[in-house]
């Protein structure tokens, strides 16, 4: 039915307007949301530098804590370092035939020790800043102390060790702390381009025996090598083995004898 005051043509012209307005509304609403990002990794790219910087920082801290942090004394050696880490440093003093002190220089010359970073030399500078090392697997003749006489070749062992390692860089493969708060370690030093096991060299010269304690001895897997070297030095009558066999007293026997003597005097 045609409205009497209208025209058919005007009605036809308005028929498509509601649909056209709906389409425009839909288009304008989707446009208001913004167009989708064409790069799905854009956010990751923005965060990547921050994450990378953080990871690099953590790695640097771990590197410093495990390999470049200087250890000023035996008490500061972490338990997880024993049997897992070696320590590099300069020998600053030799106490007797089988122990010494050294100044830890992590990284060595590669990070400036000896040319950019000075290794202290005076006793005052070194006080409280060195690590006492007990050479693993060997026992040198006992020197005179606390009223006890020195064993034969005690002075020779001390002189040899002093000349061999004092003021030299050594690498210590550490195993544990002993009852005297020394770090027990197999020690290597470079001599004429060759890396030498200090304890083994002492045994070869008859300046130490293999460690004879029934428990707690550390050899770093070198026990058989040390025992063979000792047998050879004994056959060739070197150092401690040069005297009469009936008069020989090992460092362990010497210490056991004097411990019993002290105990009887105190009781």
From Swiss-Prot:
Active site, UniProt feature: 134, 142, 182
Q: What class of enzyme is it?
A: hydrolase
- Provide any one GO MF term from the record: endonuclease activity
Instruction: Classify the protein's membrane topology as the record does.
Output: Single-pass membrane protein
Catalytic activity, EC: 3.1.-.-
Q: Please indicate if the UniProt record lists GTP-binding as a keyword.
A: no
Write down any Gene Ontology CC term.
membrane
Q: Does the keyword Metal-binding apply?
A: yes
Compartments it resides in: Mitochondrion; Membrane
Q: Which Gene3D superfamilies did the record assign?
A: 2.40.50.90
Report residues binding Ca(2+).
Answer: 139
| Bilayer-spanning residue ranges | 47-63
- Pfam families from the entry? SNase (PF00565)
Give start and end of each TNase-like domain: 85-243
Q: Where is the composition biased (Polar residues)?
A: 1-11
Basic and acidic residues bias located where? 12-23
Q: Which UniProt keywords apply?
A: Calcium, Endonuclease, Hydrolase, Membrane, Metal-binding, Mitochondrion, Nuclease, Transmembrane, Transmembrane helix
> Which stretches does the entry tag as region Disordered?
1-31
Family to which the UniProt record says this protein belongs: Belongs to the LCL3 family.
**Stated name of the protein:** Probable endonuclease LCL3
């Amino acid at each position: 039915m045609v409205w009497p005051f209208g025209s058919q043509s005007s009605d036809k012209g308005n028929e498509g307007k509601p649909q056209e307005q709906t389409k425009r509304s839909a288009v304008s609403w989707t446009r208001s949301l913004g167009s989708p990002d064409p790069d799905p990794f854009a956010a990751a790219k923005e965060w990547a530098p921050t994450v990378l910087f953080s990871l690099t920082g953590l790695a640097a801290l771990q590197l410093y804590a495990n390999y470049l942090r200087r250890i000023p004394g035996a008490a500061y050696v972490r338990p997880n370092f024993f049997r897992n880490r070696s320590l590099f440093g300069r020998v600053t003093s030799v106490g007797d035939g089988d122990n010494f002190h050294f100044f830890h220089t992590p990284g060595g010359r590669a990070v400036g020790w000896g040319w950019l970073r000075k290794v202290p030399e005076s006793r005052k500078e070194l006080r409280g800043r060195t690590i006492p090392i007990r050479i693993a697997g060997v026992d040198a003749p006992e020197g005179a102390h606390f009223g006890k006489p020195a064993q034969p070749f005690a002075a020779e062992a001390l002189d040899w060790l002093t000349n061999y390692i004092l003021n030299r860089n050594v690498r210590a493969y550490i195993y544990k702390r002993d009852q005297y708060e020394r770090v027990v370690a197999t020690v290597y030093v470079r001599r004429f381009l060759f890396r030498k096991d200090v304890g083994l060299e002492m045994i070869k010269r008859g300046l130490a025996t293999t460690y004879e304690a029934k428990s707690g001895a550390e050899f770093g897997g070198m026990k058989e090598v040390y025992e063979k070297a000792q047998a050879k030095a004994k056959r060739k009558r070197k150092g401690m083995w040069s005297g009469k066999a009936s008069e020989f007293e090992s460092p362990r026997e010497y210490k056991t004898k004097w411990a019993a003597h002290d105990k009887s005097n105190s009781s």
